[in-house]
Amino acid sequence: GKQVYEWIWKKSSHTFDNMTNISKDLRLMLNENFVINHIEVDKIQKSYDGTIKNAVKLFDDYLVESVLIPTEDRTTACVSSQVGCSLDCNFCATSKLKRMRNLNPDEIYDQVVTINNQSLQYFDRPLSNIVFMGMGEPLMNYNNLVKSIEMISSDKGLNISQKRIVVSTSGIPKMIKKLADENLKVNLALSLHSAIEVTRNKICLLYTSDAADE
């Protein structure tokens, strides 16, 4: 079990055939009974400043966006948390898409793995930072968000410090408090849009906290 776990999470293997430190019979049994779902980069768009935008295909053919943002002192992964979005912010293109489903923890994790590989390939350095600022409202996919952060920061996963992870939210008070109670060391970015509540509510329609997927 430990070997399989390491191959899937530490080495990001997408096939049981690669797991050379387990028996051939066990690999055969795993292939016959299980499937390792994984994301695929469907399209890549490169900018003059080095930014790489990926259209990522999920196992059910939905597409989300993941972006590699390079600067002089860091490379940052901007990852998605939902297919579409639970909110309706009138300045955001994603809000025009119906929220189809939440991303699973492994799909969030795989985005980071993919962008880390691109960072190594194109910039010869590993990923240094992660921001949850892609498609979707991260706090409306709360449990899967937390699980992915725990796995990304684990020494059994990518071992990226939680202090280098930013969760961006449009502001769901109940879920912000819940995240604070988790005692994670991640940073929180609040998209305020306006300091005037009436104006803010016109810009971004926040659903009630009861709508949050817990």
At which residue positions do the language-model features occur?
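Alpha-helix boundary/capping residues
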Residues: K11, N33-N37, I115, I152, ...
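Short glycine-enriched, charge-decorated loop/helix-capping segments at active-site entrances
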Residues: K96-K98, K202-L206
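Flexible, acidic/Gly-rich N-terminal and inter-domain linker regions that tether
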Residues: G1-T75
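Conserved small/polar residues in nucleotide/adenosyl-binding loops
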Residues: Y207-E214
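Short loop/turn segments at strand-loop or loop-helix junctions that form parts
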Residues: H193
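Flexible glycine/acidic-rich beta-alpha junction loops that bind and position SAM and/or redox cofactors
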Residues: K10, I176, T199-I203
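Conserved Radical SAM active-site core
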Residues: L63-V186, I196-E197
